[in-house]
């Protein structure tokens, strides 16, 4: 990756001299009682949550470096942020106050030259995940990467390979993977209580940002404290526009984000992939509304077909719904008003799983009353007592020389499945056959979307070819 010291010296650095870049042959050995030195890349919005949670507010581990292209304290918040999102929209200014001893950077490349960093969190726009995480892994640093793991299928495959080669401890930020309700769901589905699964529906109320829109004309002044060129990163340059890309609204743009499916799919499709032990899909087709050239559609239903497993009644159909699209009407009564969740249709009954909290609900409820009151209640109590925390799973794994539970051997294939669907959304109405071993569709235009182009000067060797 090419960058100049003359440009990089503008980066705010509040922590001594920089060490020369070098490739670690192995990760640093740590004792189980060590305090990790963690660096956070992207500290606004969800990055604020990740930084605090992974360090337990600085009590368990050290935040030694803060990196963000936006050095303001929260900056300009888009008007479409909900109350919860708005409360999280704290940026580098707030991070500096919480961790006053941490070095502060705009450019992750300079930050990663420090020898004292054990691990990093990556909570940036999707298009930068792979470049940052791969660079860190090749330097022997453990990585926690927010979902989606990467923006493209090819990046997911490479991330998995680099993780295996370097031996670092990895975790994708699909926090639901550690929750009681998702863990219970795995046991329920594999128990056979509702028979083998014939069909799955997964849905979200997202997007809460704009999709299905054209690129606006014009530009706005770049705010003081924002390094717009670094935010663009691997993408092709374009003018800054207030409330259009940074912050938050980048999710709807194909150049920077992955739409509602990319944002929520690694959460909500996870229980199906996990519990049913699904491999790669073999085909996908999307029906969409609100199509635009550069953004994801306003609403979609994506139909995946998976090969049979021991837990499915033959080949499995999985449907993803977003933008207000919902499950078929005959199931509307049992899914209720859950804004995000999944429905498993079995041979003997159905399971509804709300995303985020609660417990799996089995239907017809009267037929599964004894199971719900005894076995399921016991499972819930067992997992609740463990108090599993997704962030601590990762940090404990680093200290104990183990792997986390959403490590890249699991998370990368899950992310590939999600990104197969985002490609279908961009080519609506086409039945696409997917061959995971060779990273190719039976459609040239779709296959071209498996990889992305990287701006000159931002290429890294691992992602070439």
What function would you assign to each model-found segment?
Residues 142-144, 149-225:
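A contiguous active-site-proximal alpha/beta segment in oxidoreductase catalytic domains
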């Amino acid at each position: 990756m090419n960058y100049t010291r003359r440009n990089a010296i503008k980066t705010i650095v509040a922590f001594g001299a920089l060490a020369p870049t070098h490739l670690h042959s192995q990760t640093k050995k740590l004792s189980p009682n060590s305090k990790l030195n963690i660096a956070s890349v992207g500290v606004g919005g969800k990055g604020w949550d990740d930084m605090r949670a992974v360090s337990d507010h600085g009590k368990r581990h050290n935040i030694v470096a803060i990196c963000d292209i936006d050095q303001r304290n929260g900056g300009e918040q888009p008007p479409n942020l909900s109350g919860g999102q708005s409360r999280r929209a704290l940026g580098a200014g707030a991070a500096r106050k919480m961790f006053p001893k941490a070095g502060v950077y705009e450019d992750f490349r300079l930050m990663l030259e420090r020898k004292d960093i054990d691990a990093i969190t990556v909570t940036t726009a999707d298009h930068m995940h792979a470049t940052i995480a791969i660079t860190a892994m090749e330097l022997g640093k453990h990585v926690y990467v927010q979902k989606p793991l990467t923006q493209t299928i090819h990046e997911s495959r490479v991330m998995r390979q680099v993780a295996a080669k370097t031996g670092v401890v990895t975790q994708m930020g699909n926090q639901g993977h550690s929750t009681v309700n998702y863990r219970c769901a795995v046991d329920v589905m594999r128990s056979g209580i509702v028979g083998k699964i014939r069909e799955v529906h997964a849905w979200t109320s997202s997007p809460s940002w704009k999709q299905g829109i054209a690129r606006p004309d014009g530009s706005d002044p770049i705010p003081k404290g924002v390094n717009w060129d670094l935010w663009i990163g691997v993408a092709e340059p374009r003018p800054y526009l207030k409330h259009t890309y940074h912050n938050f609204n980048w999710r709807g743009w194909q150049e920077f984000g992955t739409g509602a499916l990319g944002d929520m799919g690694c959460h909500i499709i996870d229980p199906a992939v996990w519990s049913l032990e699904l491999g790669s899909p073999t085909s996908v087709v999307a029906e969409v509304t609100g199509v635009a050239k550069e953004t994801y559609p306003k609403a979609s239903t994506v139909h995946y077909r998976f090969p049979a497993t021991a837990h499915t009644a033959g080949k499995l159909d999985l449907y993803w719904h977003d933008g207000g699209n919902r499950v078929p009407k005959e199931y509307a009564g049992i899914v209720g008003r859950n804004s995000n969740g999944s429905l498993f249709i079995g041979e003997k009954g159905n399971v509804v799983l709300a995303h985020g909290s609660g417990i799996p609900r089995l239907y017809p409820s009267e037929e599964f009353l004894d199971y719900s009151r005894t076995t399921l209640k016991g499972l819930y109590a067992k997992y609740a007592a463990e108090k599993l925390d997704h962030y601590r799973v990762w940090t404990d794994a680093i200290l104990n020389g183990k792997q986390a539970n959403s490590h890249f051997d699991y998370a990368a294939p899950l992310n590939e499945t999600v990104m197969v669907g985002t490609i279908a959304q961009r080519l609506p109405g086409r039945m696409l056959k997917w061959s995971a071993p060779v990273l190719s569709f039976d459609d040239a235009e779709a296959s071209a979307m498996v990889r992305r182009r990287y701006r000159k000067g931002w290429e890294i060797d691992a992602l070439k070819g």
